[in-house]
Amino acid sequence: MERGNEKIKLTELVKLHGUACKLPSTELEFLVKGIVTDDDLLDKNILVGLGDDASIIKRNGLVIAKTVDVFTPIVDDPYIQGKIAACNSTSDIYAMGLLDIVGVLAIVGIPEKLPIHVVREMLKGFQDFCRENKTTIVGGHTILNPWPLIGGAVTGVGREEEVLTKAGVKVGDVLILTKPLGTQTAMALSRIPEEFKDLISITEEERDYIINKAIEIMTTSNRYALKALRKAEERVGDKIANALTDITGFGILGHSNEMAKNSNVLIEINLLPCIKRTPELSRLFGHALLDGYGAETAGGLLISAKEEYKDNLIDELEKAKCYAFEVGRVVKKGEGKAVLSKDVKVIEI
């Protein structure tokens, strides 16, 4: 986008990009500790409060899921940025096991010098993604802000028996991931200035593949993976998933750790499926991808699945053109943490 003769790069207007702008999990825990207490959440209609992907409230025989997600640009194209933001915002509803999103309140932060037509392109991308996923913007809020921001407050509905949380993980479960890792590193590659490109041993063809693969991942809705899970469950006539989350700013190990902590189990991650070349690039950029903490934007679902049904689940995911990586397993009860296996394998996609 251009302002007069000046080329506008959204990513140059911020210091942190996408889900990397989020508060670290330990600081987030400290922030809310003692402010929202257990007593505040005693209402029997609050089925899920803090610490999950969305809150779940029971009303008139249905459950309402509520979540909010807002972040900074990770790409320069405002339309694509809008689609990524909508994908990320809606994902937390799907990560609770619910398919029906009844509306989205768009939230936009606008720097004073950012042309309004750029903001309109972001909103257009956001709304187009919503339409593609059977929902719509129903309202929202805008503010003037030093950094551009876009996201939404999302409401989903469903039945109580459909809800999946981070707390249901069982010993013996396998963990299935529905998107590769490495979006943080891939998009950092896209921001390398022209004068420094020669310092990185990578062809233009490889660079384009890495960046386009990341954008494809960040604009692919987790709705498709959840629908595949439901189809697999219909096929076997039983529940397959014991727990569910999505992989975003805390990385695969950070989000696995939340599942392990909430379920009081030990999870071992033994596979890191990554976008091509991002493992070596992550070392160069100082990202924690190979430690399991690479910040993902609009990452995949992480499904804690019953081992006896994993082949059925993988088959339905692949039929839906989703990735299906078996990335770990639940080793034992107790400990309440996730760890990388000593012989963790890294594969490139």
Curated annotation (Swiss-Prot):
> Active site at which residues?
U19
The entry's cellular-component GO terms read:
cytoplasm
Positions binding Mg(2+) in this chain are D53, D92, D246
Record-annotated site: Important for catalytic activity: K22
Cite the entry's keywords alphabetically.
ATP-binding, Kinase, Magnesium, Metal-binding, Nucleotide-binding, Selenium, Selenocysteine, Transferase
The catalytic activity, as recorded, is: hydrogenselenide + ATP + H2O = selenophosphate + AMP + phosphate + 2 H(+)
Cofactor dependence is on: Mg(2+)
What GO molecular functions are on record for this protein? ATP binding; magnesium ion binding; selenide, water dikinase activity
GO biological process annotations for this chain's record? selenocysteine biosynthetic process
Q: Specify which residues bind ATP according to the UniProt entry for this protein.
A: K22, L50, G51, D52, D69, D92, G140, H141, T142
Superkingdom of this protein's organism: Archaea
- Enzyme Commission number(s) of this protein: 2.7.9.3
Membrane-traversing stretches: none
Q: What do we know about how this protein assembles, alone or with others? A: Homodimer.
Q: Which family does it belong to?
A: Belongs to the selenophosphate synthase 1 family. Class I subfamily.
**What job does this protein perform?**
Synthesizes selenophosphate from selenide and ATP.
What is the protein's given name?
A: Selenide, water dikinase
Q: Which organism is it from?
A: Methanocaldococcus jannaschii (strain ATCC 43067 / DSM 2661 / JAL-1 / JCM 10045 / NBRC 100440) (Methanococcus jannaschii)
Top-level taxonomy: Archaea, Methanobacteriati, Methanobacteriota, Methanomada group, Methanococci
